[in-house]
Amino acid sequence: MLRVRCLRGGSRGAEAAHLIGALVGRALSGRLSRASRSSSSSAAAQLPLSAHEQVPEPTAEECPVCAHNEWDPLEEVIVGRAENACVPPFTVEVKANTYEKYWPFYQQYGGQTFPKEHVQKAVAEIEEMCNILQHEGVTVRRPEPVDWSLEYRTPDFSSTGMYAAMPRDILMVVGNEIIEAPMAWRARFFEYRAYRPLIKEYFRRGARWTTAPKPTMADQLYDQDYPIRTVEDRHKLAAQGKFVTTEFEPCFDAADFIRAGTDIFVQRSQVTNYMGIEWMRRHLSPTYKIHIISFKDPNPMHIDATFNIIGPGLVLSNPDRPCRQIEMFKKAGWTVVTPPTPLIPDNHPLWMSSKWLSMNVLMLDEKRVMVDANESTIQKMFESLGIKTVKVSIRHANSLGGGFHCWTTDVRRRGTLQSYFL
């Protein structure tokens, strides 16, 4: 039987905010007392703040950002954009995360836009997805359009950009805090810029905002000799805990983490290293516990098409990539569901992902799920679980590397912080 424990006081952010507010208040009081000795300083201290300068502290009742898990009723969501999407240059970290049959595509088109007609179809699909989300009562927000074809240079590398299609990769909401992830692909170095207007708005309205240490992405972050010619090579290396990213500096994609209240599960992957996981552990403790889990996966990158938590004590577990720690979940009373084989045809291009995007679903609440209209078998699986399916077709959007979970970041879900893993 699944055990659930409610925590008093909401998220850790509220406590921290009040403590910081008190400390800042004392500091300001001392400063103003000293400043009163000077007439000029006193006058300056009495100047009122403009509306734009007044930034409120977050409260659980009013904060526009609040999510504790993957299934509470969804109220607001960021949905990515396919516009201007560019093929990333074929660097070692891209090679390690893509299938060999697509390597000629990257070699030919790296730095250029994805096929125009395909992107146009993806844009139309995501627009329809947004319309359906709004029809289901969810507020939809979008990142800014950006020209990703522009080349940029840092002291360590040069690259063109990629897209702002997958907010799940870069943004993670934990309680009332938005965390910007220090992603590992050089083509995604400036992706955060598309989301900054939204994040600043949420911050001004009371959300907490944290940016993890930005990696330099110097050559030392990548194993330049990483052997990835065959799937067998990848299986052996992953089993040995060896990946294309080194431990030179912290890096992680937010999509390698998945939330279940006070417990957050993460995998070490091609884009998330142990330093990145340790940074998150220290940042979120003691309220949240980070659990590292692993899978029989030759190409680990993003957990949500391998292990997708869809309800309290309910998880989809990919049969092709079994979780090595699955008994831990069963002992905790969780129900482990094996999704059916995806129906996506072999000839459909999936430049950055596998067919298992069929299980990369978005829960609107415990009893509603957004699922691909073409995947009839997984629809039946959800219906057998008593979950209503909201059907949308995003086949062309899938080609850019994500399903419904990838294409979104849930900004606000109505619920409280609880423990589901005791």
UniProtKB/Swiss-Prot annotation:
It is an enzyme of class 2 (transferase). SUPFAM superfamilies: Pentein. GO terms for molecular function: glycine amidinotransferase activity. GO terms for biological process: creatine biosynthetic process. The active site is at D253, H302, C406 (amidino-cysteine intermediate). GO terms for cellular component: mitochondrial inner membrane; mitochondrial intermembrane space. It comes from the Eukaryota. Strongly expressed in neurons and glia of the brain, the lamina propria, submucosa and serosa of the small intestine, in oocytes and on the fringes of the pancreas. Not expressed in the retina, eye lens, heart or bulbus arteriosus. Expressed in the yolk syncytial layer in gastrula stage embryos, in the yolk syncytial layer and mature somites in early segmentation embryos and in the yolk syncytial layer and the liver of long-pec stage (48 hours post-fertilization) embryos. InterPro entries: AmidinoTrfase. Catalyzes the biosynthesis of guanidinoacetate, the immediate precursor of creatine. Creatine plays a vital role in energy metabolism in muscle tissues. May play a role in embryonic and central nervous system development. This is Glycine amidinotransferase, mitochondrial.
